[in-house]
Amino acid sequence: MKYPLVFKDLHIEDYERVIEVTCEEVQLHAVIAIHQTLVGPALGGVRAFSYDSFDDALTDVLRLSKGMTYKAVLSGTGTGGGKSVIILPKGMTRPTEDILRAFGQAVDSLNGQYIAAEDMGVSVSDINIINQETPWVCGIESVSGDPSIYTAHGVFLCIKETAEQLWGSSSLKGRKIGIQGLGSVGRKLLHSLFFAGAELYVSDTNQAVLDEVTKFYGVTVVPVNAFPTLECDIFVPCAFGGVINRSNVYNLRCRAVVGAANNQLENPSLGAVLHAQGILYAPDYLANAGGLLNVALAVGKAYCPKTVLQKVSQLPLILKEIYQQSENTDQDTVILSDSIVEEKLTAYI
């Protein structure tokens, strides 16, 4: 079935292309943001969420797509940066098959400029449905599978590197670690941290998930609003972005922030505030790059899990270099990581 799609180009400065896509017939309302394709096709996840307003959705997709550029360049995927959001109608918690198929046709119309993958609110099985309408997807079950496994592993390795920087040992035994959000990545990360001997404090809005992890991992459940100011060794944000903001940044009681969430800082300038307080911050687009590496290394080539694992294992080495530069120059890690990316991008201009 061919869906009657309506396209509207939104002219946004510093973005190659931003397109609003609608199809009233199936209630599709989406935005595809292509930040840059200098390095390769714009690769990024599809997020489905019931936003309060279109402006909220646009702000989210613009920040996320730019973050994908930085994530791709710093981790060396050979891809560009893009992202998309499906704005779910009020009361809808998951995209319907028609919405996914219509969205797939929208992606297909871009002829490979944007390659879609799973993200919050969109499962691997949803990507399989989108794949029925376009070949421009990655992370499907028959090829590279669920990328959250590699996202969680990359964050875990970066947490261990952060422990090494803080205490001279990568051991997490007895370390108090707070995980905010137990979605597909957060739960896998919790599993690794449990077996590493960490003392775990968790929050989530899903009571069933909390009951399950309490039973099987013996975690301590804290209220959602306990983060990010909960006293702990390492705070691990794995839910929405902007969790660290002007109203709470001076009240953090952790030694480090290392998480899977995108855009953890409401504003990049808060990196300097964390640095001034002696709080180590692992740039989010580096720590959570494992999932992107998993799907990107299947684009245009045969998928090899050992190659993916090797690339993900390099993330803490990059983080170590950034931490050391931060200590040597007294600059915050956000400025340093951004400057590394921007320097690499100039080589393509």
Across the structure, where does each feature detected by a protein language model lie?
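Adenosine-phosphate binding glycine-rich loop
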Residues: A163, R255-I349
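Rossmann-like adenosine-cofactor binding region
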Residues: Q207-A282, A287
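Flexible, glycine/charged-enriched surface loops at secondary-structure junctions
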Residues: A72-T77, Q113-E118, W167-R175, S326-D338
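A short glycine/serine-rich beta->alpha loop
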Residues: G139-S148, L280-Y281, E327-T329
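Buried hydrophobic packing segments
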Residues: V61-L64, V155-A163, L292-A296
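N-terminal ligand-binding/catalytic initiation module
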Residues: M1-S142
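Glycine-rich phosphate/diphosphate-binding loop of Rossmann-like nucleotide-binding domains
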Residues: D146-I234
